[in-house]
Amino acid sequence: MATQDSQGIKLFGKTIAFNTRTIKNEEETHPPEQEATIAVRSSSSSDLTAEKRPDKIIACPRCKSMETKFCYFNNYNVNQPRHFCKGCHRYWTAGGALRNVPVGAGRRKSKPPGRVVVGMLGDGNGVRQVELINGLLVEEWQHAAAAAHGSFRHDFPMKRLRCYSDGQSC
């Protein structure tokens, strides 16, 4: 294992000397402006990829828009950074093949709208209110007139129907 001598640490057959005195002297001689550059030089290799980040904006190969942003480096090939085009909402890699990807692929979908009142309808038996809640059509019936005629009254006042986008009745 490792043993400690007055000269340094012996590890795997090699002696590592202590240089704490020389490091402290070097830190004292550096002005504060150079401390930031020393910290950058001593950073890990993951920070080096951030330094390689492209500075110039590259036009989108599909729509030729200059509204692109750098996303990250490709995991398989660091020489092909991944970009995102704000114009056509597609990802692309510089130097990579253009794939036939639909617009907005891989992006998060927006939340559906909240509760929206579609309309208020009336008929002979009672008042019918139609509302749209998260893509479902909901009908509320007030059964005052239906109960007065002696007909069967439902215990559940709300009735759910599927609403289709092609305009057919629900």
From Swiss-Prot:
It comes from the Eukaryota. Its main location: nucleus. Residues 25-51 are annotated as: Disordered. Expressed in the vasculature of cotyledons and hypocotyls, leaves and roots. It holds the Pfam family Zn_ribbon_Dof. Keywords: DNA-binding, Flowering, Metal-binding, Nucleus, Transcription, Transcription regulation, Zinc, Zinc-finger. This is Cyclic dof factor 4. It comes from Arabidopsis thaliana (Mouse-ear cress).
